[in-house]
Amino acid sequence: MTEALYFLDCYMKEFEATVEKVTDDKFVVLDRTVFYPESGGQPSDTGKLVRESDGAEFNVLYVRKFNGDISHEIDGENVSNGLKAGDKVKGFIDWDRRYRHMRMHTATHVIANVIEKEAGAQITGNQLGLDQSRVDFSLEVFDRDKFAEYEKIANDLIAQKSPVNLYLVSRKEAEEKLSRLTTLAKGFSDEIKEVRIVEIEGVTIEACGGTHVKNTEEIKGVKIIKLQNKGKSNRRMYFTLVD
């Protein structure tokens, strides 16, 4: 199983690794990686792998989880001289892309928490993007006028410069001690023995595997740009970052 270096250090930009296997000349599994695989509504990292023996470069186009491994899809430009099991490589992520997603992801936790607490909404999904992100939620009474207030509350929380802590707890601890996580933890597969926690101090505690900033001040601010009624009690909110 690939060691996910991003799990507890989201600020790593480069790393060294060994190729464990290559499938179809383009799907590369490493023993360790900083590349985030698409999951939880967060798009994958992109970047490049550089073979140490000859400096050959391989662009990483997409990253995903597959059968317990983290698979890096590389372009086909160097297929004739492609990566092979045992090759030593250095990996470099597109930091601007990663950092934007980190800010977006932490912002999503903040603004979703505000909607839950202030409106009584139930969050049903999310999708991060570079320019805008969305939060899906269930809410019976959809008072659009109140979302300007929710935006202000979210920005006030962001301005508090709250530390964002990442840590692992046992599945048992998550189920017993963190009431917010009980349902989520019980929904995990039996193989999961530890739960990764994202705690925004004074704001929210979540079970989350994504990448996040260290402090809410890095988000700078959020702006709600669109609200949609998706039928019955299903709602959707789009927001962007204020730079």
From Swiss-Prot:
The keyword Zinc applies. It comes from the Archaea. Binds 1 zinc ion per subunit. Gene3D superfamilies: 2.40.30.130, Threonyl-trna Synthetase, Chain A, domain 2 (3.30.980.10). InterPro entries: Ala-tRNA-synth_IIc_core, Ala-tRNA-synth_IIc_N, Alanyl-tRNA_Edit-Domain, Alanyl-tRNA_Editing_Enzymes, Thr/Ala-tRNA-synth_IIc_edit, Transl_B-barrel_sf, tRNA_SAD. Keywords: Cytoplasm, Metal-binding, Zinc. The keyword Cytoplasm applies. One of its GO terms (biological process) is alanyl-tRNA aminoacylation. Zn(2+) binds at residues 105, 109, 208, 212. Its cofactor is Zn(2+). Coiled coil: none annotated. One of its GO terms (cellular component) is cytoplasm. GO terms for molecular function: alanine-tRNA ligase activity; aminoacyl-tRNA deacylase activity; ATP binding; metal ion binding; nucleic acid binding. It is found in: Cytoplasm. Functions in trans to edit the amino acid moiety from incorrectly charged Ser-tRNA(Ala) or Gly-tRNA(Ala). Has no activity on incorrectly charged Ser-tRNA(Thr), nor on correctly charged Ala-tRNA(Ala) or Ser-tRNA(Ser). Belongs to the class-II aminoacyl-tRNA synthetase family. Editing domain AlaX-M subfamily. This is Alanyl-tRNA editing protein AlaX-M.
